[in-house]
Regions:
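Structural and coupling elements of P-loop NTPases
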Residues: 1-314
Length: 314
C-alpha cells in the first residue's frame, strides 16, 4: 500500500551562478547543526568539482541533507545549464519540489529558465527564495513580479503561480516570510520547505525499485550509484536484479555490498533504507545512470530519461 514518508522532504535547488545558492546551503547546514560553531566551513560546499569552484557553476549534481525538527531534508543541486538537459530531468525526478533562488537585485536570469521549465513541466511545487535581500539596491517587489511573469511565460499552473515567497540574506543567516519580519535565522525557510513540499510516497512492502540517477566514484569502492527508492526496502547484502536502462532484457544479478544515506555533507552507512530515501549503493562494478535496482523475482525497470551530452566548452 502506498504511504507517505512524512519524515523526509526531497528538494532540488535552482539558481543562477552567483545568486548565493551555495551560501544558502552552507547556512542551512550550519543552522541545522552540521557544523560546530568553531568549525571552518569551506565556503561553497556544493561545488566539489574543481572546474565548478573556479567558475561557480554546477555540473554534477550534489547531495546534502539537513535535519529540521525531526524531518530530514535532502537537498540536491541542479546543473544550471541547458547543456545538461538529461541530467536536470533525472535530478528533478528524485525530488518532490524545488527552491528557486533569485537575487533581490538582479532578478530571474535566463540561465535558470531551462531548469525551472523542466520543474514546472514535471508539476513540481516551487518555493521562491529572494536572496541577498540586504543589498542596498535590492528591489524585491519588482523581482517578485518578474518571477511571476517568467512562471506565466513557462506555462505554470494556477497552483504553481500561487507559490510561497521567502526573503533571505544567506550571508547574514536569516530568512523572512514578510519583508518587515524580524531578522532572526533560517527557520522561516525550513518551515516553508516542510509545510509546502509534499513528502515522498511509495509502497515500502512492494518489490524494490531504485532508479540510478547519478554516479559517483571512489577509488576504494569504485562506482557508486545514487538514486531515490520509489518502492520497497533495500538491505545490505541483499541480492537484487540490475536492469539495463537501454535494454530491459539485459538483467544482471548483483549484491548490495554497502548502502549509504546522506547526512550533512557525508555519506553514512546504513543497514537498510526504504521509500523516499535518497541512497548510494556500492559494490556493483558496471552500474550506470538509468539502471534500475529491482527485486530478483519481479525485475520491473523504471522508465529512464536519456542524458544529453554536455555541450559546454571548458
Amino acid at each position: 500500500m502506498k504511504t507517505k514518508r512524512e519524515d523526509i522532504r526531497n528538494i532540488a535547488i535552482i539558481a543562477h551562478v552567483d545568486h548565493g545558492k551555495t551560501t544558502l546551503v552552507d547556512e542551512l547546514l550550519k543552522q541545522s547543526g552540521v557544523f560546530r560553531e568553531n568549525q571552518e566551513v569551506a565556503e561553497r560546499v556544493m561545488d566539489s568539482n574543481d572546474i565548478e569552484r573556479e567558475r561557480g557553476i554546477t555540473i554534477l549534481s550534489k547531495n546534502t541533507a539537513v535535519h529540521y525538527k525531526g524531518t530530514k531534508i535532502n537537498i540536491i543541486d541542479t546543473p544550471g545549464h541547458a547543456d545538461f538537459g538529461g541530467e536536470v530531468e533525472r535530478v528533478l525526478k528524485m525530488v518532490n519540489g524545488v527552491v528557486l533562488v533569485v537575487d533581490a537585485f538582479e532578478g530571474a536570469m535566463p540561465q535558470t529558465k531551462f531548469v525551472l521549465k523542466k520543474a514546472l513541466e514535471l508539476d513540481l511545487p516551487v518555493i521562491v527564495c529572494i536572496n541577498k535581500i540586504d543589498r542596498p539596491e535590492a528591489r524585491p517587489t519588482e523581482v517578485i513580479d518578474e518571477v511571476l511573469e517568467l512562471f506565466l511565460e513557462l506555462d505554470a499552473s494556477e497552483e504553481q503561480l500561487d507559490c510561497p515567497f521567502v526573503y533571505a540574506s544567506a550571508k547574514s543567516g536569516y530568512a523572512m516570510v514578510e519583508l518587515d519580519d524580524e531578522h532572526k535565522d533560517m527557520q522561516p525557510l525550513f518551515e516553508t520547505i516542510v509545510n509546502y513540499i509534499p513528502a515522498p510516497e511509495g509502497d515500502p512492502d512492494a518489490d524494490i525499485q531504485l532508479l540510478i540517477s547519478t554516479i559517483d566514484y571512489n577509488e576504494y569502492v569504485g562506482r557508486i550509484g545514487i538514486g531515490k527508492i520509489d518502492n520497497g526496502t533495500l538491505k545490505v547484502n541483499q541480492e537484487v536484479m540490475m536492469v539495463n536502462a537501454h535494454d530491459p532484457e539485459k538483467q544482471k544479478r548483483v549484491k548490495i555490498n554497502k548502502l549509504y544515506e546522506f547526512d550533512g555533507l557525508a555519506k553514512v552507512e546504513v543497514n537498510e533504507a526504504t521509500i523516499g530515501a535518497i541512497v548510494a549503493v556500492s559494490g556493483i562494478a558496471d552500474i550506470h545512470i538509468g539502471d534500475t535496482i529491482c527485486s530478483v523475482d519481479n525485475p520491473v525497470a523504471i522508465p529512464f530519461q536519456k542524458i544529453s551530452e554536455p555541450t559546454i566548452a571548458m
